[in-house]
Every structure is written in C-alpha cells, then in structure tokens.
Amino acid sequence: EANKRAFDKFSVRELIHICRYGRGHVIGFHPEGKRSLSSDPYSFLPAQPGIGKVIYEAQPQVVPVFITGLRNELAKQILGNWTGGEKVRIWFGEPIELNEFYTKRDSVRTHKEISDFLMTKIGELGEKDRAEFEAHK
C-alpha cells in the first residue's frame, strides 16, 4: 500500500511536469479516476480531485472529450473491427476557461471543483451525443 501511494505521488508529479513543460503532448484522463463499467454511456462516476490537482498546478489547455461505443470487453471490441461492432462516437468540446479556479486557494476543495466543472462539460457533450443518437434511431 505504501509503495502504491509513493508511485501514485510520483505519477502525479510526472503528469504535472509533462502538462506544464511538455508542449504538444496529449494526455487522456478520466476525471472519475477510472472508466465507468456501467452499460449506460451517459452515467458517470463522481469526479475525483486528482485531475483537478494536475490542472491547478500545471494550468494546461483542457479540452473535454466524450467517448461512447467502447465496451469493457477488449476481445469483443477488437472482434468488432471485423464484424461491424458498435460504432465509437467521439465528441470534442471547446477548450475550457479555468482562470476563475487558479485564483482560489490550492486545496482539495478547489481541485474537486475543477474536476466537477470538467465533468459538467463532458456531461454536456454526452447530452449532445444522446440527442443526436436518439434522433437517428
């Protein structure tokens, strides 16, 4: 457990460094801390403060993304490439403005607020997908 925590802290520091100084890098991150295993692509787990901490400290450009159509069974997902499996739909939002958070105190509360705000933006993209997908059923 102690080794895992030490590795997690190292990973967060490294991620902050890459976000701050690694121009041109694209990093995908689940604000929930992991992928939801729900079959409903529009239900999310609660946002965790970890990505908020990374964003607060590195102040990178943040683009929300909503992805649906990926399943939790890798073998079926790969097989779907040949058998016409479910289409993967990806929605990219506009870069989001986070300056209002950078003037707040560096705290877990602020990190959580950033993560929640990001999840709201991802949820908005999910609602666009739902409206578009339901209209074409």
Feature annotation, model-predicted:
Residues K9-K137:
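Non-catalytic C-terminal accessory region of glycerolipid acyltransferases
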Residues E1-D8:
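Catalytic core of membrane glycerolipid acyltransferases/transacylases, capturing the structured
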